[in-house]
Amino acid sequence: MILQETYTLSNGVKIPKLGLGTWFIPDAQASEAVRTAISLGYRHIDTAQAYENEAGVGEGVRTCGLPREQIFVTSKVAAEHKDYDSAARSIDETLEKMGLDYLDMMIIHSPQPWADFRGGDYAEGNRAAWRALEDTYTAGKLRAIGVSNCRKPDLDNILSDCRVRPMVDQILLHISNTDLGLLDTCTTQDILVEAYSPIAHGEALKNPMIVEMAARYGVSAAQLCIRYVLELGAVALPKTADPEHMKANATVDFTITPDDMELLKQTAPIKDYGEFSFFPVFSGK
């Protein structure tokens, strides 16, 4: 069962292959969503400072009835923190807000502030933020550290001047958005890829080819999308607060044939994410 399967990070820490994404889940609903997911077998919860629901997520983890060490909890340093002091301070604030003594992983949310996504040169700021993560990791408050939305030059920048190598790169990865070059780079550097929005924020469900292929496998289009990123060797982080969707998203114990995987890898890119296109990560940059 996928909820019991894990990958092993470069430092030996095990991370569940399937997690609950919490983007767009309001803080007031987050604790219940987390408790529900954990009751259904989820052991991996992903949040971020920018989601503004860390308090609720932390409450859900603390009150789920399971020992803390059984739940893998990730948060993200806000994209705007591009200096050591603000990044370090934000990590401590996250721990306090969540009511947790440690996080299983903390990652830099973006190599650029959202207002300048894929814009200016923030290499020095990213190295400074990374040092804050390294120091917090060394202090034992974080079990693993990584990055998000990083391309090869961003990764090279961190790798050129680090004491602890990034363990993950959490990226937009789904059918119709598969950067094979970046996946190869991460594999070469022993960086695990995590896929946020593996269902393309719902847009993949509108693709007739995906719907038809899913029917051939006897699964939903969403399940095919989640299985796809798992077949690529990535962590899947579908977001939902709906218990039925949580159950369905975890029912992915099937295999996509190599031929179908090749077809899915070559699916034409999504050019329009509908009402969510204004978000920088969906802008095509």
Task: Describe each PLM feature range.
Residues S10, G58-R68, L95-L100, L159-C162, ...:
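Acidic (Asp/Glu)-rich catalytic clusters
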Residues I25-A37, D83-M98, P153-D156, N177-T178:
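Short, acidic/polar
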Residues A87-I108, D135-A139:
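CE4/NodB-like, metal-dependent polysaccharide N-deacetylase domain
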Residues R68-H81, Y102-P111, L173:
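A short, structured active-site edge motif that brings together acidic residues
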Residues Y42, L100-L103, L142, P166:
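A structural motif
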Residues P113-K285:
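Beta/alpha (TIM)-barrel catalytic core signal, keyed to glycine-rich beta->alpha loops juxtaposed to Asp/Glu
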Residues K17-A28, V77-Y84, F117-G119:
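Active-site mouth loops of central-metabolism enzymes
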Residues M1-I71, A200, G284-K285:
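N-terminal binding-site loop/beta-alpha segment at the start of enzyme catalytic domains
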